[in-house]
Amino acid sequence: SVGLSVTELLEIYRYHEPQISLPSESAALLLHLRRKNIRLGIISDGRSRTQRNKLRALGLDWIEDVVISEEFGSEKPCEANYLYFEKKYPDYRFTYIADNLKKDFVAPNRLGWRTVCLKDDGRNIHSQNIEIAEVQKPQFIIDKLTDLIKVEEKRL
């Protein structure tokens, strides 16, 4: 026993400053996209403070359009989270990258977005070894974020 209640332990977990970082090639790709004025956004489930702490730790707090379920009032796969981007950027095409096969791809598939699953490298909390319905399947699966370049070449 550590002498803390479950509530206290949850508070520590939810509000700690995580010690995480992006792989260097992922950070370089995002910087490259930013320099090319390609709009990036984030859709994330979870508590606002927890998710914002993660974004800050990853150096992604520069991304303007962030939809966090606690702030937005709906969770994936609710289409409202995705429609935020369609309403704000009506003339854009969207590519959605995620890793949770159970819920991440349902709404963007229905909306006609390009969907890409970042394959689990063994550290993901969401199992990718599951049976899923067709609507849950991404159109593409990549091993690392830099493989996104190959996916986008297929769009042209």
Please report, for each region that a protein language model flagged, where it lies by residue:
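Asp-based, Mg2+/Mn2+-dependent phosphohydrolase catalytic module
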Residues: L4-T7, A27, L31-R34, S48-L156
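Short, acidic loop-to-helix structural element flanking the phosphoryl-transfer center
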Residues: L10-G41, E79
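Conserved phosphate-coupling serine/threonine residues in phosphotransfer and NTP-handling enzymes
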Residues: S44
